Amino acid sequence: MMGKNDNLIEDYRNLVTNTLLANPTIVEVLSDGEYSLEEADELMWTHIFPNQYIPDTITETGSFILYDLSDAVISRVNKTYIEVTLYFWVLTHYKMPKYNNKLRNDILVRELRKDFGEKDCFGIAKAHYVSNSIFNSGTNKYTGRLITFRVTDWSDRIRYKD
């Protein structure tokens, strides 16, 4: 029996997207205070990208969140489970590092840790915070962080949600 999607990554990606768009602080920082939660969808593909993709043609300053997932089937004696790793790349243009006198990257990382760290955000198990490291965006116009979480899906519960 399969759930909504036959692709586990797609299921998780949808949950991550919805969580990001429901966070008022993330919406405020990414939109520079211009969007409310009701307008949060406008951030998709402009400031929120559901894959590790940095468009060559970004001309605006501000902050961006990119995210992606990987999964692996782990087999142990008499047990098989899926381990999902969730990656967030937080990027901010060097001309706009601050929002309300705080570093944008720090604000966004804090919110990601609140929304995903040590929480059962996927309805299957706690997402464990793994790392927060410096990320080089490949261009000297953006400062970046790479935040990683790991979730172990012991029973493939995401697929059985209604």
What residue ranges belong to the model's regions?
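Generic short beta-strand segments
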Residues: L69-A72, L91, N132, V151-T152
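Oligomerization/assembly interface segments of phage tail-like spikes and tubes
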Residues: T80-M96, Y142-D156
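Small/polar-rich, solvent-exposed N-terminal microdomains that initiate assembly or binding
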Residues: M1-S75, D162
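Hydrophobic beta-strand residues in large extracellular and virion-surface proteins
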Residues: V16, L20, I65-Y67, L86-F88, ...
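Exposed beta-sheet edge/beta-hairpin loop segments within beta-rich domains
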Residues: V73-I74, K79, S137
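Extracellular/virion structural assembly segments
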Residues: K79-E83, L91-K114
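Acidic-leaning, charged glycine-interspersed low-complexity segments
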Residues: V27-E28, I58, G62, L103-D162
